Curated annotation (Swiss-Prot):
Similarity section: Belongs to the pterin-4-alpha-carbinolamine dehydratase family.
InterPro entries in the cross-refs: PCD_sf, Pterin_deHydtase
Species of provenance: Bradyrhizobium sp. (strain BTAi1 / ATCC BAA-1182)
One Pfam short name: Pterin_4a
Entry keywords, A to Z: Lyase
Keyword Lyase: yes
E.C. code: 4.2.1.96
GO molecular-function term, one example from the UniProt record: 4-alpha-hydroxytetrahydrobiopterin dehydratase activity
Reactions that this protein is recorded to catalyse: (4aS,6R)-4a-hydroxy-L-erythro-5,6,7,8-tetrahydrobiopterin = (6R)-L-erythro-6,7-dihydrobiopterin + H2O
Gene3D superfamilies recorded: Transcriptional coactivator/pterin dehydratase (3.30.1360.20)
Protein name per UniProt: Putative pterin-4-alpha-carbinolamine dehydratase
């Protein structure tokens, strides 16, 4: 089982992640992605879904038109782990490739 990050490690990881922040009231990180339109937002979600499935680590997310709101936390560990940081990095790379 993967271990939950310490507060210091989580803060350090967030410094390296663009646009991500701690979610108030939860041991989780979050970010909103905004795309040109719904098709691009859905394409992003599709690409992330393939990565998430391969890693067996899935985001909490919602999509409204061209915005995708993401929350990452590892339920089995009760908070943010390296799995969340790695998925956040992958999401950032996918979003950047679509810009």
């Amino acid at each position: 089982m993967v271990e939950r990050l310490s507060a210091e490690a989580r803060t350090d990881a967030l410094r390296k992640l663009s646009g991500w922040s701690e979610l108030d009231g939860r041991d989780a990180i979050s970010r909103s992605f905004t795309f040109r339109d719904f098709n691009e937002a859905f394409g992003f979600m599709t690409r992330v879904a393939l990565v998430a499935e391969k890693r067996d680590h899935h985001p909490e997310w919602r999509n409204v038109y061209r915005t995708v709101d993401v929350v990452l936390s590892t339920h089995d560990a009760g908070g943010v782990t390296l799995l969340d940081v790695e998925l956040a990095e992958a999401m950032d790379a996918i979003a950047a490739s679509m810009a």
